[in-house]
Amino acid sequence: MDTLVEKASADLKSTFTISNEMSEKIFVIPPNRTRYLSEIAENNRVYDKKGLEQFEVAQKLYGIYKTICSVMNVSSNEVEKSLIGKLGLNEDEILQQAQNDKGIAIPKEGGTTDEESQRSLLHLLIKEFDRVKLNLDPYNWEIITTWDEKVKKYKNPIYSFKVRDKDINIETHSESLSHLQIPKIALPKYQAWGDLLKWCLQENVPGEFPYTSGLYPFKRTGEDPARMFAGEGGPERTNKRFHYVSAGLPAKRLSTAFDSVTLYGNDPDLRPDIYGKIGNAGVSICCLDDAKKLYSGFDLAHVMTSVSMTINGPAPMLLGFFMNAAIDQQCEIYIKENNLEAEVEAKIAEIYKGKERPKYNGDLPESNNGLGLMLLGVTGDQVLPADVYAEIKTNTIAQVRGTVQADILKEDQAQNTCIFSTEFALRLMGDVQEYFIDNNVRNFYSVSISGYHIAEAGANPITQLALTLSNGFTYVEYYLSRGMDINKFGPNLSFFFSNGIDPEYAVIGRVARKIWAKAMKHKYGANARAQMLKYHIQTSGRSLHAQEIDFNDIRTTLQALYAIYDNCNSLHTNAYDEAITTPTEESVRRAMAIQLIINKELGLNKNENPIQGSFIIEELTDLVEEAVLLEFDRITERGGVLGAMETMYQRSKIQEESLYYETLKHNGDFPIIGVNTFLSSQGSPTVLPAEVIRATEEEKKFQIKTLKNLHNANDTQSLLKELQHKAVNNENIFEALMEVCKVCSLGQITNALFEVGGQYRRNM
C-alpha cells in the first residue's frame, strides 16, 4: 500500500473512524463458540456413556448385596433394607445379624461349619462391595437408597409437591367404573439396582431430571392442555371466535393467527397488494386499539388466562400492543373499583374534543363483559396519576401469561415472514428478553422456538426436531454472549412442534426434553427451571387432505393421542376442513371435542405416563436422540446454525425431504387412505367448500378507517425519532417500543426500524 501511495503520489489513507454505533463485523455468535452444537452432542453422549458405566457398577453392587443376604439366609425385606444405609452397607448391622442368626452356617473344606468362616466371607464381601462402590457416583447411590421412599409417595392417596413455593396436593389414583384404583403414575417393578438406576438416569418419573416423561409430577387439574388457534377478519370477528372456542372452559387459552399484512409489519391500506389480504387467513391488527378489541372480555392478567401470538418479524411491536392492552385492562379495573368512571370519561372527552373516538365494530358476544374497551383511543397514563399507572404496569407485566412466537431463525429456514435483517431481528429478540429479565416478566415466553413450520414445509420429524433444538441452542448462545443469566432467560424459552403420524412423532416430546435438559444442566450449568423444555403441539396441517375430508378427524385424533400420551404442555387439534377452507364453528367444535374426549373419557389417559416402559418407545427414543445429535454435528461442520443458513443448508434439506414424501405419495408407495388407496366409488375427488370464509369489504374499510383516525389523533414523529435514536445508540429497543406502541401504528414502527436496522434480504 505504501509503494502504491508513493508511485501514484496520492493520499489513499482512510480517514474513516468507527464510532460506538458502528461495527466492522457483527458476530451474533462469538467465533470461538461456533462448535456449540457438537459440544452439546458430545456432552449428551458422555452423560449416556457414564450412565451405562454406572449401570454396570450398580448391577455388581446389587449382586454382592444379594450374595450377602443369601449367605445370611435373609428372607425378610425389612431385614434386607436394614443392611444398607446412606453411605453404603451397614457393616455393624450385617455382623450383628450374622451373630444373632443361629441357623446360618457356612461349610468348611472338611464338611464342618464354623462361625469364623462365615464372618470371614462376610468381611470379604463387604470389602469387595466397598471397593466397587468407589466407582459409583454418590448421587446415584442416593437414587438407589431413596427409591422405596419414592414408591411410597406415589402409593399414598395424596402426593404433595411445590411449584414456585406454592403447595400442590394431588390425588395419586383415580377410580374406574369397575371400582379399580388406577394409578396416575405407574412405576417400574425393577429390583436390581442397575436397572433402577438406568431407568432413573434416562427416564425417571415426571417432574424429575431428565424430564423424559414430563416436566411436572402430575398434570394440572382444572386446566386442560387445549389451546385453539383462531384469527380471521377484523379484531371483533376473531374476538367473537375466541369467546366461542373458550366458552364453558375454566382456563382461557387463546392462540392468535395474524393476516399476512400484519405478519409483514404493514398497515391496512388501499394498495392492491395489501387490500385483498386484510383480515384473510388471520386477524388484522395494526395498533393498540385493535389489540384491546381482540382480547376484550378476557382478563389478560388472570392466572387462568393465557395468550399465544403467532407472529415473528414484527413480534416486538405486537408484543408491545398486547402488554399495553393488558396494562390498560388493569387500569380499567382500578377505575371501576375506585368509582372514577365519570372523571376518566371527562378526560377522554377532552382529549377527543371534535374527533371521532375509536369503537368496537358491532355487538359484543354474549360472554364479553366489555373489559378492555373503556380506554379505547387512550392509555392508562393519560387518565391516571403517574405513580398509580406505574404500579399497575409493574404488577401487570409480571402477571400476564402467554407466548409470542418471535422465532426469526425458523422464518429464514422455512416460513419466510422475515422483515428485518437477521442480525437486527436477533437484536430485537435479545432486547425483549433483556426487558423481561429487568422487569420480572416470568410468566410470558419471549420466544416460541418452532418446528411446526419446518415440518409443514416438508421436513421429516427428525429434521424438525434437530433444526428446532439447534435454533434453540443458538438463542441460548446469543443471549449468553450478551451477558444474560441463563437461569433468568432459560425459563422464558418455549417450543412448538408439529405432530404427524410417523413413528418418530410418538417420542418427539420426550426426546426434546431429554436433549434439552442434559445440555442445560451439564453443558450450561442451568438450574431446574431452565432445564425444563415446555412445548406446544399442533396436529399436522400437512397431513390433512382435500379428498375424503371426514377422514381427517381420524388422523387428527391419532396425532392428538401421540401428543397427550407424551405429556405435551398445550395442544391444538386441527379442524377436518382446514385442507379446503378456514374452519367453521362446527368443525372447530369437533376438533376441540377430539382432545376433550381423550382427556375426559379415554380410560388409559387417566394414567399420566402410559408409554413409559414400552420396548418400542424406549428404542425409538434412543434412535431419534442419536439421529438428532448426528444432525447437530452436520450443522457444526457448516459453521453452526447461522453459517449453515448462509448456504441455505436447512432450506435445501427441508425441500429434499418434502420432495421425497410427495414422490412416495403420488406413486402410491406411501399409502394414504382416501387419497391414493381405499378410494370411494367416485374416486375420492377433491371436496370443494360450501363457502370460502373471507374478510368482508366492511371489515377491511373499518380497519383502514381505524388506522386513519389513529394517525390523525396522534403526533408520532418525535416518538419514532426517539425509537431510532435508541436503536442506533445500542439502547434497549423494546423498552422504547412499549411507549411507541401506545400511539403509533404497526406500519409506522416497521418503517422507522427499517431505516436503522435494515430490511431482510435472502442470501443467494
Question: Residue ranges of each PLM-predicted region?
Answer:
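Extended helical scaffolds that flank P-loop GTPase cores
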Residues: 3-94, 98-108, 112-193
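Generic recognition of stable, solvent-exposed alpha-helical segments in well-folded globular domains
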Residues: 3, 120, 124, 249, ...
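Short acidic (Asp/Glu) and glycine-rich catalytic loops that position anionic groups and cofactors
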Residues: 1, 271-274, 300-303, 411, ...
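Short beta-alpha connecting loops at secondary-structure transitions
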Residues: 413-418, 454-460, 496-504, 538-549, ...
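Intrinsic disorder at enzyme termini
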Residues: 569, 601, 605, 627-719, ...
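N-terminal glycine-/lysine-enriched basic segments
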Residues: 575-581, 601-623, 635, 708-711, ...
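Catalytic alpha/beta active-site cores
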Residues: 148, 152-499, 504-505, 523, ...
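Flexible glycine/proline-rich, aromatic-decorated loop/lid segments
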Residues: 442, 483-489, 526-539, 547-579, ...
